[in-house]
């Protein structure tokens, strides 16, 4: 294997199997997308603390930071995928990526956590706005609505469109003011669909699931993410 390989750490998600055993997994759709890039190695990132991750949400500091930093230092980029709860483990990785300027893509819950971390009123934001009806919850493999791309954002330069169709599998939304992040996508009903952290190679969060569609716009997003990891021209 002569060519340089790049490691992308995917945050693992916890669930309980039929025997009520806590299992860690990664989203298969994300793994499959990354296998399309020959020089990318996806790995699963696991918590380094001795606790039930499924029940451990934001609030308690990470003790084994040196152990976690050891594996994060090996990664060239990160994906924080969808899930159910905000975790301090996820938050630590997002802060690490920002501090070290390593590319990171937040998807669905990962995006919502990014938004929460930089909200002006964190306690208020931790209870995300509950959407009424199912206007944002559908089949991950099909388009459900469109999002308007904000001009002069990193995302607008990536997709080169003012509006794109997206899938949607979320029942919560974010509509609060925040610090530091830049809004890059909004749906017609006012729901914020994407954000990005300025002055970094690639720190972008999206409410939709580009890994499930992997259409022309999703491919542009992942291509830009990978190029940022390789430090190639965008």
Model-found features: residue ranges?
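Short, basic/aromatic recognition patches
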Residues: 168
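Active-site nucleotide/adenylate-binding loops and adjacent lid/helix of ATP-dependent enzymes
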Residues: 161
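N-terminal beta1-alpha1 cap of cysteine-dependent amidohydrolase-like domains
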Residues: 1-109, 115-117, 130-158, 171, ...
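Active-site-proximal beta-strand elements of phosphoester/diester hydrolases
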Residues: 204-208
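Post-Walker A helix-loop "phosphate-sensing" segment adjacent to the P-loop in P-loop NTPases
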Residues: 118-126
């Amino acid at each position: 294997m002569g060519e340089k390989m790049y490691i992308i750490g995917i945050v693992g998600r916890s669930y309980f199997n039929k025997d009520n055993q806590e299992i860690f997994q990664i989203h298969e759709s994300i793994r499959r997308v990354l296998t399309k890039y020959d020089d990318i190695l996806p790995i699963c990132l696991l918590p380094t603390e001795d606790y039930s991750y499924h029940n451990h949400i934001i609030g308690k500091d990470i003790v084994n930071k040196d152990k976690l930093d050891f594996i994060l230092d090996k990664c060239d980029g990160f994906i924080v995928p969808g899930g159910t709860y905000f975790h301090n483990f996820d938050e630590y990785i997002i802060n690490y990526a920002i501090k070290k300027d390593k590319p990171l893509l937040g998807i669905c819950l990962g995006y919502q956590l990014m938004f929460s971390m930089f909200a002006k009123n964190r306690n208020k934001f931790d209870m995300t706005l509950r959407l009424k009806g199912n206007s944002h919850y559908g089949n991950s493999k099909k388009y459900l609505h469109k999002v308007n791309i904000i001009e002069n954002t990193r995302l607008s330069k990536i997709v080169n469109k003012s509006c794109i169709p997206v899938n949607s599998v979320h029942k919560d939304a974010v509509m609060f003011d925040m610090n530091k992040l830049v809004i890059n996508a909004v749906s017609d009903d006012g729901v914020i669909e994407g954000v990005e952290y300025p002055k970094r190679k690639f720190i972008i969060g999206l409410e939709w699931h580009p890994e499930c569609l992997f259409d022309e716009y999703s491919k542009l997003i992942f291509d830009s993410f990978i190029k940022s990891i390789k430090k190639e021209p965008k």
